[in-house]
């Protein structure tokens, strides 16, 4: 038995470990869907896959508690697939390798999937525990939350039964989330006719790497380096000073993760390679001085001589693209005026792919205000349309408006104080949660989000704080037992 399965409470950790052994990257969920269906049937609860690909459990009330308000427990089954450069992990076929490092559970070379595997594991523990006392419980485990909340957006109306929604996708133990930001995906694209490379030119690959990355909602306010935004500074100077020409660009791979690596292939006269290397070395020094408190592990900016490609980006298009990337806002745009420590609006320059006659730039914009979300979209449209790019939006979801008078919130705060002797914290998150989407279909629900502590989700340093899982479980059980009558 893996040591993780012996952690307290075993009912959650054994289920979480089992989830790590089933591949479940966003977009490839057939194995985890079948696993959850089989689990539900073995647990003796109602278990179906709905037309959207979500898994729906239903557990009847403990005898005598049928008159309690119905609770819907909710989490998402998919995980962000990120791995270290040296990792050979295949997320579609290989199990995650979790391990215990002191007070944390981590993964070897990949994301851990505690976001949102611990929430799913808690739901599984509720479903299979015959000793718990509770009213009627529905559970919704959604598909593809990380890539656009597709399961929640396609949730059939009328599928769920309940009065209260408890989302288990928050990542700060002791904080109870009652609101979150909305978001929208913005994609700029351009098709272009490639130019021939000068046959006498050399080529180099310039890479910015070893950044921390992170969650583009929860950690956007920390000032972490964005590999695309750092690389564009380097590339812009190399074009100006060494006659370099852009052949290709690849940076970032997840819309909701701060990119930790980006690389560009450049062509240039052979006699300018030495000057290029000096400029790149200077940028590495500059970046490490600028980010020394935020990226203490050390940012790497490296040059590798590569085979000269046959084609490159035409000069005018290259200049337009580089200028647009340079001008594109990244990071926090505004904080909530009434809560100056809470981010209201942000954008994440997430993914850039340029080469073979195509350019694609993807940004995730977030805001707790619809008018500010629209403002960011217009700003990005202006930025990239000036470069001749076509700008489209998709995957829009609204924010979740806080309800400080929520009955389930105040029950949780009461139980938390009685169990642990301290006050819980009410919070509004800048991250997107499925609560807003589900509320759009079930507007009468009383909603709250909670969970154990996790750090650096969406990165290869993702980790779960072991000591917070047991109290999370105790609070969940006690709250379900004390849900009021209808």
Question: Residues of each region from the PLM?
Answer:
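Active-site metal-coordination/substrate-binding segment of hydrolases
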Residues: 65-163, 203, 315, 326, ...
């Amino acid at each position: 038995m893996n040591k993780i399965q012996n952690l307290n409470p075993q009912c959650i950790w054994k289920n979480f470990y089992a989830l790590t052994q089933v591949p479940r990257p966003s977009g490839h969920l057939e194995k985890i869907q079948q696993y959850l269906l089989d689990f539900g049937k073995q647990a003796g609860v109602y278990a179906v896959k709905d037309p959207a690909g979500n898994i729906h459990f239903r557990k009847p009330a403990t005898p005598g508690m049928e008159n309690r308000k119905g609770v819907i427990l909710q989490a998402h089954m998919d995980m962000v697939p990120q791995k270290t450069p040296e990792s050979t992990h295949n997320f579609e076929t290989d199990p995650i390798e979790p391990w215990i490092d002191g007070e944390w559970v981590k993964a070897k070379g990949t994301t851990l999937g505690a976001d949102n595997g611990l929430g799913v594991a808690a739901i599984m523990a509720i479903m299979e525990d015959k000793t718990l006392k509770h009213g009627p419980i529905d559970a919704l485990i959604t598909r593809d939350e990380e890539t656009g909340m597709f399961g929640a957006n396609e949730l059939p109306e009328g599928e769920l039964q309940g009065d209260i929604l408890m989302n288990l996708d928050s990542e700060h133990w002791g904080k109870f989330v009652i609101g979150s930001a909305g978001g929208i995906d913005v994609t700029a694209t351009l098709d272009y006719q490639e130019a021939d490379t000068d046959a006498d030119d050399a080529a180099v690959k310039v890479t910015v790497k070893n950044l921390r990355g992170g969650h583009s909602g929860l950690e956007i306010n920390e000032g972490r380096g964005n590999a695309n935004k750092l690389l564009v500074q380097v590339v812009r100077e190399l074009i100006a000073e060494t006659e370099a020409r852009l052949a290709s660009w690849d940076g970032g791979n997840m819309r909701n993760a701060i990119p930790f690596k980006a690389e560009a292939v450049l062509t240039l006269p052979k006699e300018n390679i030495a000057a290029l290397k000096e400029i790149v070395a200077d940028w590495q020094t500059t970046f490490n001085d600028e980010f020394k408190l935020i990226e203490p592990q050390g940012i790497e900016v490296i040059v590798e001589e590569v085979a000269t490609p046959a084609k490159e980006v035409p000069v005018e298009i290259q200049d337009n693209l580089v200028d647009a990337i340079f001008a594109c806002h990244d990071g926090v745009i505004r904080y909530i005026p009434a809560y100056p420590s809470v981010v209201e609006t942000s954008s994440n320059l997430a993914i850039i792919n340029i080469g073979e006659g195509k350019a694609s730039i993807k940004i995730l914009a977030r805001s707790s205000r619809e008018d500010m979300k629209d403002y960011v979209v217009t700003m990005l449209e202006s930025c990239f349309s000036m470069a001749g790019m076509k700008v489209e939006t998709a995957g829009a979801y609204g924010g979740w408006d806080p309800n400080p008078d929520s009955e389930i919130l105040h029950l949780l705060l009461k139980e938390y104080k009685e169990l642990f002797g301290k006050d819980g914290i009410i919070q509004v998150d800048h991250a997107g949660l499925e609560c807003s989407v589900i509320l759009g279909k079930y507007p009468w629900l009383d909603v709250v989000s909670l969970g154990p502590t996790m750090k650096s989700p969406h990165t290869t340093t993702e980790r779960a704080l072991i000591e917070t899982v047991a109290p999370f479980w105790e609070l969940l059980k006690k709250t379900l037992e004390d849900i009021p009558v209808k």
